[in-house]
A protein has these predicted regions:
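C-terminal catalytic core of tyrosine-transesterase DNA break-rejoin enzymes
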Residues: 14, 18-25, 92-95, 99, ...
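C-terminal secondary-structure termini that scaffold catalytic or DNA-interacting sites
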Residues: 73, 160-166
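Basic, Lys/Arg- and aromatic-enriched nucleic-acid-binding interface segment
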Residues: 1-23, 27, 73-74
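Conserved catalytic core of the tyrosine transesterase superfamily
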Residues: 1-14, 35, 49-50, 84-85, ...
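C-terminal catalytic core of Y-nucleophile DNA break-rejoin enzymes
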Residues: 48-68, 74-95, 107
Length: 166
């Protein structure tokens, strides 16, 4: 039984939350782009859709868990075969977010933002996260680091007034 479009969009979105891939890259990702190496499973894109640069992204178990079963599909088969347009996917994500009680604007790009912010918040360094995202300039990645710093400031400020000041 083929998964519904809603399920395919959800799987691809969550996969991107753990890989940082753009919609244009995940929608064209084939089984042939996924390689087993001595270091683990990696995605190897010869040319990213947006930047036309080569990108290699290691896959962690969380990312792998969101991938559909390959079965006997050829290497040329797209991994997330049901994705049509980013607009259609964004409409599905908006509906899924609403059903889940999420009151924020969610688009496919949100997964990329989620990956970057979480990788930095977990202690990943700016340079490595920048390379994983395929950014040409570390300044582009700095936007996500600023979000993490804002969150740290909010957390520290929660402690104000907790104890009597001198």
């Amino acid at each position: 039984v083929a998964p519904t479009i809603n399920e395919q969009v959800r799987q691809a979105f969550m996969f991107c939350c753990f890989t940082g891939l753009r919609y244009s890259d995940v929608s064209s990702l084939t089984w042939g782009n996924i390689k087993q190496t001595s270091l683990g499973v990696v995605i190897s894109l010869k040319a990213m859709q947006k930047t036309k640069r080569m990108l290699t992204v290691p896959l962690n178990q969380s990312a792998i868990s969101w991938m559909p079963e390959r079965n006997k599909q050829p290497l040329s088969q797209r991994v997330f075969d049901g994705l049509v347009t980013v607009g259609q996917c964004d409409r599905v994500l908006k509906r899924l977010a609403k059903e889940a009680g999420v009151n924020k604007v969610v688009s496919f790009h949100t997964s990329r933002h989620t990956f970057a912010t979480n990788a930095l918040a977990a202690g990943g360094d700016l340079y490595t996260v920048s390379k994983l995202l395929g950014h040409q300039s570390i300044r582009t990645t700095q936007v996500y680091a600023d979000v993490v710093m804002d969150t740290k400031i909010e957390a520290v400020n929660l402690l104000n007034g907790l104890f009597n000041s001198r």
